[in-house]
């Protein structure tokens, strides 16, 4: 089945964290990204339409040991229960130009099959 999206998904396994409205921090696992958003797994059932403060730990493009912490906001678009976790689809906002460029470089790299 063909995907109906402007940008194909970039499959990743990156760590991240999300701040709940209660100010509790929950660890997440980013599963895939596009230029507009992402899917991640989370132990909490997030609220559709809610905007959450988030951080994504993006690996070094050259395979080095360092990661870049990318702060952003994620607006919850859907939540699907998958086993003991929830799969969450979210739209990005609040990315700095520098961090947006980093994610675009990763996307280009994955499109070339290098990742």
Regions flagged by a language model, labelled:
Residues 83-115:
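C-terminal output/interaction extensions
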């Amino acid at each position: 089945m063909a995907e109906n999206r402007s940008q194909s998904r970039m499959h990743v396994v990156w760590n991240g964290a999300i701040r709940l409205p209660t100010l509790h921090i929950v660890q997440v696992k980013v599963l895939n990204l596009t230029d507009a958003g992402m899917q991640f797994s989370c132990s909490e059932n997030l609220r559709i339409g809610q905007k959450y403060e988030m951080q994504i730990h993006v690996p070094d493009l050259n395979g080095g040991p360092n990661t870049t912490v990318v702060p952003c906001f994620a607006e919850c678009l859907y939540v699907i229960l998958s086993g003991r976790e929830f799969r969450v689809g979210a739209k990005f906002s609040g990315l700095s130009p520098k961090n947006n460029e980093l994610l675009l470089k990763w996307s280009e790299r994955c499109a070339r099959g290098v990742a």
